[in-house]
């Protein structure tokens, strides 16, 4: 029969002469390898592709349906001339590698006590429920070809198609080279033992070493129902009985263990014409049996006899299957589910096996231990591209797609900052905003949701782990204690403060690529527009200001920007010396802010504006001084960004109560331009606000929010949730993670992907007391 022909063809290609392994190297069934990651296994070639997880479990019903159909389309696209193996790999995190990549090294700069506290928090997180396991996903394609060139051409074509289909699912697929592919097996066989050296195929060949020496364990023992790898225990199981209806969460639940394990789904697709012919023949047989039974009943004068239930059911199911194949774009497939798990002791192994069996029974399925086939089972479940277990089950595309390998998206970027734990998988969320297309960020949440704490935690991580500069616009005086504890400078800007910022400070590095004086002249024009009212400075007055600005800075520039910069008082006196009456009018209009009671920006700077961490505390500015104060502060921030860029240094800018900035045209326009330009200058901006609805009244702010690659959404009010759902395309299920949730919990949107998260920080630490805004917990000095 045709299907038997398909199976026999596959069995013939997979058949190998059995030889008893004389060493652990012989027990590895890979015969040859190539630098691009292709294996020769038996008489066939295999290649593995990795793919990332997607947010399936928290998606809405409609989104789940769309993902399911896209995944079914991927399965339909599999070539019937090859076999596919989809593998989920629970890999233990290597503690030494983790510490090297994430823990903060000591610097002996007076901040090491904070680094120790931060590292203790990270270590307590990684040893939590599931954080010690990373889940990887692979699809291995195996095909029989005459030589490596034909195989390489085939994998190139199939790989492009596969990666395209994965992209439709928002999953990123990539080919694995030989080092990446062999690393999978080394991690499995040797646990999380770090490699003394990276695998180098060329070097191994030159020395005459086998690649198997690098990845194989010291010993392998196979028993009736388990095996041993060095001092670890393992067991292979397979899915023996399938329920009539399987939930799409079964595979995710089977893999939801804090253990090293692999689960593989082998798929062998049948050509549609052969499948239809076989089902038609089967239906013909069923109809013949029914007709014969009816004829016998008629011969016995039993004309009212009803066809037996099992025969009627067989006819119905066969017709449905034929309809699936001919009208519903389904393909017939053979499937096999195998699973291997490892443990440190036999008792733990038996306990884990029972957990797996119980999970399968919950879904009305039966997982069984392979008896006397542990070696064949291991070769089948590992992503070599082999299938040595014959327990195949006939499935359609839909019934295969139910075994969906997706659960929850993970964000774990090397060299990034810790932002919390994935609320679904409990794994760490680590993001490097510098690697995003646009690393700018918003933190949105109602009062008490934890947005300030979240920003402070990010500031702490940046301050303790990098040499980047941090500038904070602080309208509510919330960041001062933390900044001072980290060795930074708090600049309190107000009419009554002893702290002064000279609005006319300028050095060689001022401004962008143009002449510093041209940039400063533009700034002073903007400043006077704020002083006398936007649109009230005439063209004649602008010319006078430009001339006077040059006169005031002439001597300072001749001295190569050395000495003290001029102040607004110098500009005021220069205006009074001009012959035009408009000049005296400008001087009179600006008198309140230069020689009057609001003259804080007309005096020489008396604070350290070169400190690595600066908080500009503008809480006491007042309505009269706010426009000019905002202008001077933002000018100082932007020029610090430019200066750092010229030095090759990264600058992080944080703006609290971001909605306040959009009450003033200049500050709104400044941040909009900064949002678009700062990436060019090695900078990143973060806006914090609780008044989302007020912020979104500005079209500019909406555009900035929609174009931000990194968002942290905490607990939201009902109206804000509706606004954000429409703007950011957040599903109802995802909205539940920002509805009446605890402080520090919510959603992270990173590069278009939305992940629920939770974040808590140990309360019995000095860092917590510096970061919290609760009055009874705040530490007023460190």
Regions found by a protein language model. Give the residues of each.
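Extended, folded cores of ATP/NTP-driven motor/assembly subunits in large transport
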Residues: 1-406
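P-loop NTPase motor domains
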Residues: 54, 61-80, 87-91, 255, ...
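Hydrophobic anchor at the beta1->P-loop junction of P-loop NTPases
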Residues: 443
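Conserved lysine of the Walker
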Residues: 451
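Hydrophobic positions on the alpha1 helix immediately C-terminal to the Walker A/P-loop
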Residues: 454
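Post-Walker A helix-loop "phosphate-sensing" segment adjacent to the P-loop in P-loop NTPases
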Residues: 461-471
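A short helix-turn-beta junction within AAA+ P-loop NTPase domains corresponding to the substrate/partner-engaging
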Residues: 487-491, 700-713
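Conserved P-loop NTPase
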Residues: 728-781
């Amino acid at each position: 029969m045709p299907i038997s022909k398909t199976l026999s063809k596959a069995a013939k290609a997979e058949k190998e002469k059995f030889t008893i392994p004389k060493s652990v190297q012989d027990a590895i069934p890979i015969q040859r390898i190539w630098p691009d990651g292709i294996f020769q296994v038996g008489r066939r070639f295999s290649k593995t592709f990795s793919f990332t997880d997607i947010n399936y479990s928290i998606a809405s019903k409609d989104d789940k349906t769309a993902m399911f159909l896209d995944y079914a389309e991927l399965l339909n696209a599999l070539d019937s001339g090859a076999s596919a193996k989809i593998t989920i790999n629970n890999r233990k995190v290597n503690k030494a590698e983790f510490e090297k990549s994430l823990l903060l090294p000591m610097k002996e700069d007076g901040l090491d006590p904070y680094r120790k506290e931060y590292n203790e928090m990270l270590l307590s997180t990684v040893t939590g429920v599931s954080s010690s396991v990373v889940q990887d996903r692979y699809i291995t394609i195996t095909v029989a070809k005459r030589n490596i060139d034909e195989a390489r051409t085939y994998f190139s074509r199939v790989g492009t198609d596969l990666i395209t289909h994965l992209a439709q699912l928002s999953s990123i697929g990539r080919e694995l080279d030989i080092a990446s592919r062999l690393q999978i097996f080394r991690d499995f066989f040797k646990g999380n033992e770090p490699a003394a050296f990276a695998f180098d195929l060329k070097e191994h060949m030159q020395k005459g070493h086998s690649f198997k020496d690098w990845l194989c364990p010291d010993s392998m023992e196979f028993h009736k129902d388990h095996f041993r790898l060095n001092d670890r225990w393992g067991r292979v199981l397979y899915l023996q009985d399938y329920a009539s209806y399987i939930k799409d969460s079964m595979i995710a639940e089977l893999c939801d263990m804090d253990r090293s394990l692999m689960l593989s789904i082998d798929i062998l697709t049948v050509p549609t014409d052969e499948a239809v012919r076989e089902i038609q023949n089967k239906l013909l047989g069923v109809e013949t049996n029914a007709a014969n039974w009816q004829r016998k009943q008629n011969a016995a004068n039993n004309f009212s006899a009803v066809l037996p239930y099992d025969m009627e059911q067989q006819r119905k199911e066969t017709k449905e299957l034929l309809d699936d194949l001919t009208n519903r774009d389904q393909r017939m497939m053979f499937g096999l589910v195998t699973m291997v798990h490892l443990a440190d002791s036999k008792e733990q192994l038996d306990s884990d096996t029972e957990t797996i069996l119980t999970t399968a029974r919950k879904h009305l399925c039966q997982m069984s231990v392979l008896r006397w086939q542990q070696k064949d089972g291991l070769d089948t479940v590992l992503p070599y591209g082999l299938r040595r277990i014959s327990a195949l089950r006939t499935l359609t595309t839909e019934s295969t797609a139910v075994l969906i390998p997706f659960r929850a998206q993970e964000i774990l970027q090397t060299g990034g900052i810790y932002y919390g734990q994935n609320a679904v998988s409990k794994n760490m969320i680590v993001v490097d905003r510098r690697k995003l297309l646009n690393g700018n960020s918003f933190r949105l949440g109602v009062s008490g949701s934890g947005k300030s704490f979240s920003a402070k935690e990010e500031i702490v991580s940046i301050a303790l782990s990098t040499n980047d500069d941090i500038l904070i616009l602080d309208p509510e005086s919330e960041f001062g204690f933390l900044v001072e504890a980290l060795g930074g400078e708090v600049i309190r800007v107000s009419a009554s403060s002893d702290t002064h910022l000279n609005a006319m400070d300028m050095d060689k590095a001022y401004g962008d690529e143009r002449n510093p004086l041209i940039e400063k002249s533009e700034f002073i024009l903007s400043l006077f527009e704020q002083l006398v009212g936007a649109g009230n400075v005439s063209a004649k007055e602008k010319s006078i200001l430009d001339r006077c600005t040059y006169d005031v800075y002439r001597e300072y520039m001749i001295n190569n920007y050395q000495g003290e910069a001029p102040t607004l008082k110098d500009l005021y006196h220069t205006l009074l010396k001009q012959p035009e009456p408009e000049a005296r009018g400008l001087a009179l209009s600006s008198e309140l802010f230069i020689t009057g009671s609001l003259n804080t920006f007309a005096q020489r700077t008396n604070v350290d504006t070169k400190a690595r961490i600066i908080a500009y505390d503008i809480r006491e500015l007042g309505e009269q001084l706010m426009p000019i104060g905002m202008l001077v502060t933002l000018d100082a921030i932007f020029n610090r960004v430019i200066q750092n860029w010229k030095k090759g240094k990264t600058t992080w800018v944080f703006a609290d109560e971001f909605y306040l900035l959009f009450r003033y045209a200049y500050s709104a326009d400044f941040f909009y331009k900064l949002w678009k330009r700062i990436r060019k200058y090695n900078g990143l901006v973060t806006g914090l606000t609780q008044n989302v609805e007020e912020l979104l009244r500005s079209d500019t702010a909406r555009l900035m929010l929609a174009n931000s690659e990194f968002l942290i959404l905490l607990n939201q009010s009902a109206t804000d949730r509706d606004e954000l759902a429409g703007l950011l395309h957040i599903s109802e299920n995802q909205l539940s993670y920002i509805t009446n949730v605890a402080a520090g919990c919510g959603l992270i949107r990173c590069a278009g992907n939305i992940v629920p998260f939770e974040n808590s920080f140990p309360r019995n630490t000095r860092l917590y007391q510096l970061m919290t805004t609760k009055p009874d917990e705040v530490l007023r000095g460190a």
